[in-house]
Amino acid sequence: MNDAECLSHLLQVCARKTEEFVRTLDSKHMVWLLEIEEEARKMFSSDFNAEPELMPKTPSQKRRRKKRTSIVPDENRDPSGRRISRRRSSANWSNSVRRLSIRNQNKTNEDSMQEEPAQPKRMTRARAQASIMCPSVVEMALPESPSQLYQKNVQVTISEQDRRSAEQKLVGSATEESEMKTDVLPVPKIAKDTISEIVNTVVPPPVPETPAVPVTPENKSRAAAKLKIAGSSTPIEAAEMVDLTCESPRPANELANEQPLNLTNQSVTPTGSKSDRRSVRRSLVVVKPSSRRSSLASQFSLASKRESMTREAVRKSIRQSIAKKKAAMETSSASSQRSCQSSIEIIDDEITIKIRPETAPSESVSEEAHTIESPRRSLRSRTFKKIAISNLPDSEEPQRRVTRQMVAMDAEPTPETTDDAQNIRRKSYKRAVDELSDDERPSEGERSPPRKKTPSPPCPPSKIVKPPPHMKSFLHTVQKNQLLMMTPGSIGKNIMMKSFIKRNTPLKMDPKEKERQRLDALRKKEEAELQRKQKIEEGKKRKQEELKLRREERLRKVLQARERVEQLEEEKKKKIEQKFAQIDEKSEKVREDRMAEEKAKKKITAKKQEEVECRRRQEEEARKLKAKQMEEEERRHQDLLQKKREEEELERQKKIAEAKRLAEQRQAEQERERQREQQLLAEKERLRAERERIEREKALQLQRELERAAQEKEQQRREAEERKKREQQERLEQERLERLHKEQEAKRLQEEQQRKAKEQAAAASAPVMNVTVDMQNSPACESYEMTPKSYKAPSVKVNEENYGMDLNSDDSTDDESQPRKPIPAWASGNLLAQAIRQQYYKPMDVDRMYGTIDSPKLEELFYKSKPRYYKRTSSAVWHSPPLSSNRHHLAVGYGLKY
């Protein structure tokens, strides 16, 4: 029984593991394989140029995938941040037209299509993105490849109402009428030769005289709007096989001859613009896919929508530009130069229109074949070759030529028309210059006619064409560069410099020569365009081959990695199976061991129960004994507690009595302390009174000493005055004596001189020979002393009290240890202390003695102003007096002597 349960459990585990493995295959590996298949199909398609995107496996790949752009671009999002180049102006314009047209087509498709219930299913990333981008299109898998669909015939079922409207609209072909009588219409496979034969059978219809854009009425085109031409095997072929020659309404028989009938399975009439309703008349017959599912996928694919809407927008814009150009050419009659240019442009259009009926079928087939090879061809070549003149309706009447004579016959232009014509001329010139690439533009000699040496006839001022300013500067720069590039060897002696000044008067030119030049220029442009296209195609093919090689290498590496992963998974599965087998064996052994353990445990538990019962009885007896012991212990404990409480009560009473005794002692101590403090206060008060008395006595003694010192000073002053008076009297007496002595000496000298004069006179009168002179009795010997004493001025007594105030003192100070003069008595000792006390207690009023001294103004002293003059320094004004406390500190610092 246990073996059967284990076997059933093992089968359940295996079934669950198998289901998980199948679910993993369906949810992961099959999705990977589908994605690889989609990427491979994209790689081998002609318009694939993106990198293959697979589902991310690691977090880094997921983050990298967030930074990439989507595989299917958002058609409703306008690009931003792109630089607009002059060379790419037409391509950017076509891109913007394509985006706007696709938006409108998406809105139309959302209104016209019927919503079908979508079933939940597993989708790859590309399908999910396609369903997000086109929510109205029902996502259906393509069971067959495009090559298989192309080999099948298509059967399309239509309603009776559609059939009747088609019979009314498209009558004229017996074979097609017989096909329309049946509800099921087989559409055979059509080769390219058949397409070329159908195109060759197209006859250009007559065109009315007025070249205007036709407007088809609503009621006539509504029935025909339901008819859709079957798409090609691929969306690229269906998008490229479009004929742009038919723009005007044509008869029903021509439409029947041109278009074989092929109807879709849509039952809703699409509501769109008139150009959308006329799309039936602008298409060729191609093969329809085999089923409704593939028809929807090819009909509503983004590539076919994008190409069809691009062509429609380009066609509409070219119709508008050509209509504006024609209206401007008809209304404008400017100068002969502008009319000549307009006639050249119109002749170009006429020649292209004339050539169109013969070359249209072959060109359309060749252009379609070329477009299938390279679907992303530039819009400039399309507009230049295929679309530029196809909007002009054909006519059986002779073409209307606008020549120089017809323009000359027009009326005189008004200023407004002249300005309009000039603006149109400039715009057309700029457009022509932009449409030509650098290597396609004709040279200066090809663009301008040969000049004549004869002077041109005068032209009225109103018809003079002045080149625009940028052309003047451009031509001037070109001529200057040519002159700079010339070498001295390349210029001959007799060669004259070519003038770069352009003549404003128009020059006559042969129309045949001009036509030949125009055809040559057109041929050169076509050749250059073909070469450029070939180079572009070669570059694209080379890049596509390189991309394919890279993708193949990348896919090969991915497949190798997948194989390695699968091998690792297989090994892991084998290991898991082995582990499961080992686990089963171990579980069997464990189960047997568990059964034996359970039996042993049962025996052990029985023994344990008996032991527990015995132990319980013993514990019950022990508990009873313990309860008795606890009661006795509790009783003893209560007795002890009672005794303890009594002892604590006695102890508490003792503590209270002790506390009372301590409180009384503390109170007595506080009382004694208070008395001691009162005694100390009284002693302090007595000492303070004694100190005040002593201070008063000291003050009185100091006052008496000061009075005594003042009296002594007064006495000294009087003594000094008396001494000065005595000295002055003595000095005056000495001066008087000296003056008398001088007067006596002067008188004696005068008398001596008189006597000498008399003796000389007597000697002169008497003979002097043999006369003996007695020197001793001579009065000359007694006239003066032989060694007179030197005169000594009386010495002035030095006042010892006047220290350092004489003229002999210099700026240097004395040394304290060795003064040059004796220190006076009033500068030391008791006299100094008395002077300080007197100045301290009775300071003199300096302001009353010397008057108020104003603070010096340093600006007036030095005749200038400096910031330091206003700072509190020794050389500046002190705005605030020194603190009064400093004065007290100075006085106390000397230490008064008592």
UniProtKB/Swiss-Prot annotation:
The keyword Iron-sulfur does not apply. Residues 512-730 are annotated as: SAH. GO terms for molecular function: protein kinase binding. Signal peptide: none annotated. Keywords: Cell cycle, Cell division, Centromere, Chromosome, Chromosome partition, Cytoplasm, Cytoskeleton, Kinetochore, Microtubule, Mitosis, Nucleus, Phosphoprotein. Residues 455-470 have a biased composition (Pro residues). Belongs to the INCENP family. Component of the chromosomal passenger complex (CPC), a complex that acts as a key regulator of mitosis. The CPC complex has essential functions at the centromere in ensuring correct chromosome alignment and segregation and is required for chromatin-induced microtubule stabilization and spindle assembly. Acts as a scaffold regulating CPC localization and activity. This is Inner centromere protein. The lineage of its organism: Eukaryota, Metazoa, Chordata, Craniata, Vertebrata.
